[in-house]
Amino acid sequence: MQGSVTEFLRPRLVDIEQVNPTRAKVTLEPLERGFGHTLGNALRRILLSSMPGCAVTEVEIDGVLHEYSSKEGVQEDILEILLNLKGLAVVIEGKDEAMLTLSKSGAGPVTAADITHDGDVTIMNPEHVVCHLTGNNEISMRIRVERGRGYVPASARAQTEDDDRPIGRLLVDASFSPVARIAYNVEAARVEQRTDLDKLVIDMTTNGTLDPEEAIRRAATILAEQLDAFVELRDVTEPEQKEEKPEFDPILLRPVDDLELTVRSANCLKAEAIHYIGDLVQRTEVELLKTPNLGKKSLTEIKDVLASRGLSLGMRLENWPPASLVDDL
């Protein structure tokens, strides 16, 4: 096996064994030692709690006002019927909720196959028993199915609904997760000469609405998205300090000696208390010509030297001189 000793192996989806229509075993290998339990536990928790799915949330049964009652001609009490309805495995396509209806008469079992629905809904377990009728009795109900995630108890939804909720509309504890059971096992794996690797085997039982491979892919995507915040830590730095733009061009803060003028011109400027280039550029030609011993030749020299630095006489500088120069004087 080639590669750096610090390079981590990347697992691959090795096998999906379909044990029965609702149970499958998914195998991933090779994994670095210890990563079998690390990933197995994380994926197990996500698969149990975070897979989106559909569940029954409300039921209305003709002739029934509340869940703590029974219905004549029905073998089960209402609470047991609601519990059975929670076992429906439903898939909704293209929308977030659907209304199903169930009407049945005559003695015998009432199953999910007796439920009528539109083409956007598929019931994956039509053999699922809802209740049993006795004699020549009938039952009719309307069932609301919604898409969601996790577990939402009926009591939590009751607190958010208005007090005018119709009598007879029964709320159901909604378990949206399509994963009924999940377990994992870590076995030994080998790649060429390395025998200290892990093989992760995930044993998953669903309600038949979720493909095992798709379930693993969704769980891994959720895990990766949650970890992105840690990956992006390298991009989180202290707020960038904005560089304060200097109030004056640095060249204006330099002494006039840096202009390397002739001795005559330099002495004339010093006699007028012109110590910095910023002092000089604010003077006009007329003002400089009034300076003793500074003639047109010196003026021309000064203008040429300033021009070579992108400056000129007669410039206006707000707030000149800066405090730092005043302190130095």
UniProtKB/Swiss-Prot annotation:
Gene Ontology cellular-component terms listed: cytoplasm; DNA-directed RNA polymerase complex
Record field: catalytic activity: RNA(n) + a ribonucleoside 5'-triphosphate = RNA(n+1) + diphosphate
Residue segments, region Alpha N-terminal domain (alpha-NTD): 1-234
Documented EC number(s): 2.7.7.6
GO biological process: DNA-templated transcription
Keywords: DNA-directed RNA polymerase, Nucleotidyltransferase, Transcription, Transferase
Top-level taxon of the source organism: Bacteria
GO molecular function annotation: DNA binding; DNA-directed RNA polymerase activity; protein dimerization activity
Subunit structure: Homodimer. The RNAP catalytic core consists of 2 alpha, 1 beta, 1 beta' and 1 omega subunit. When a sigma factor is associated with the core the holoenzyme is formed, which can initiate transcription.
Domain free text: The N-terminal domain is essential for RNAP assembly and basal transcription, whereas the C-terminal domain is involved in interaction with transcriptional regulators and with upstream promoter elements.
Protein purpose: DNA-dependent RNA polymerase catalyzes the transcription of DNA into RNA using the four ribonucleoside triphosphates as substrates.
Name recorded for this polypeptide: DNA-directed RNA polymerase subunit alpha
Organism: Shewanella violacea (strain JCM 10179 / CIP 106290 / LMG 19151 / DSS12)
Taxonomic lineage: Bacteria, Pseudomonadati, Pseudomonadota, Gammaproteobacteria, Alteromonadales
